[in-house]
A protein has these predicted regions:
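Long, contiguous binding/interaction regions
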Residues: 1-89
Length: 89
């Protein structure tokens, strides 16, 4: 079974979003399909930070990237996501 590593930049919906709670929610929502490797908080402007999340996904599951992105964008704390990179392991 092949695996892929993907990095997303996740922009919170508001500057008041608690990033620690958002990290936990992401881990919970994706626990059945992804292995979270790390989170990095990246300052953007005016006190707003984005989350960079690196995760490992199974390559042989059809539509896994779409399913992952759908789960992320359905969270009310997430305003927008951006794919930073996808690589095979």
């Amino acid at each position: 079974m092949g695996r892929i590593v993907i990095a997303y930049k996740i922009f919170p919906s508001e500057s008041t979003v608690d990033l620690e709670l958002l990290k936990e929610k992401i881990k919970t929502q994706l626990s059945d399909i992804a292995s979270i490797q790390k989170f990095v908080e990246e300052p953007i402007a005016f006190g707003l930070c984005a989350l960079i999340v690196n995760m490992v996904l199974p390559e042989d599951v059809e539509g896994i990237l779409d399913k992952t992105e759908k789960r992320l964008t359905e969270m009310e704390e997430v305003g927008q996501i951006q794919t930073l990179g996808v690589n095979r392991l």
